[in-house]
């Protein structure tokens, strides 16, 4: 079978020239602009290389493949398959480390070494699973069951946040993996981490995984609603961790834009009042995303506009003062635009009754 040595997976360094080779003035993806294709690490890379090579030479005249080119292609495909198999073996080794029981009666040094090995395995898996083929193989190897069942609730924060990060990495834009993760009950655990974990890094990584499970994923969003995810998101925006606040507000804004049908639910939760309260806090770049979410909440939604007009909120005065603060400050132009849009939407109408009917 395949050579397991480090040289066994190497591809031929250059594609033998055809009668009319690709121009060296192409995309510049090869090192130094030499025109030699970079060896693909797996089938996905091989496919991308073939697409790129084909796009550089439109409509070439059909001609038989030379024996030299045929041999190169066979070697490239063999190496790509071998590289994929080797990465699967790496994942299996990582899962063996993660599946082991914690050493019984171990001393402090031994426990620290054990944790480092597990963290290293999770980090390697996160790197490998950036590739969608590897992410699918990881799930087929029952890796996701292990993450959700054991590592999201591990005692060490370093294991919890790495598990959450790996779940997000695998789930990004892959519906089949998202469905498996949701079926394992991961979203409930991730929301609990976001809401209650004592480690800020765990909370940030949990939010990343949640975002990967609910954006562009209807089943995930429905679970998110049933688990009162919007309340968890609002509490995250009220924390003192800047990264957590910004990412929570950004996710809220994204969900409002993509799913306007849930605006009524959010208004009934008092979201308008809570967002305005956040805007009243000491000014920070985070406010851009809060005002963006508020804009999304009132756009084409009269109930949101009416709530923004409530006199006790004092929103109009707040927005006008903020506009004055942000004038001539280039770095806050998006926030300024949100303020102006809110003023136009909520406070420029000649009559309040016109929006009620």
UniProtKB/Swiss-Prot annotation:
ARM repeats lie at residues 130-172, 175-215, 218-257, 260-299. Residues 1-68 are annotated as: Disordered. Keywords: Phosphoprotein, Repeat. GO terms for biological process: positive regulation of proteasomal ubiquitin-dependent protein catabolic process; positive regulation of protein ubiquitination. SUPFAM superfamilies: ARM repeat. Gene3D superfamilies: Leucine-rich Repeat Variant. Inhibits HSPA1A chaperone activity by changing the conformation of the ATP-binding domain of HSPA1A and interfering with ATP binding. Interferes with ubiquitination mediated by STUB1 and inhibits chaperone-assisted degradation of target proteins. Interacts with the ATP-binding domain of HSPA1A. Detected in a ternary complex containing STUB1, HSPA1A and HSPBP1. Interacts with PGLYRP1; this interaction blocks the cytotoxic activity of the PGLYRP1-HSPA1A complex. This is Hsp70-binding protein 1. It comes from Mus musculus (Mouse). The gene is Hspbp1.
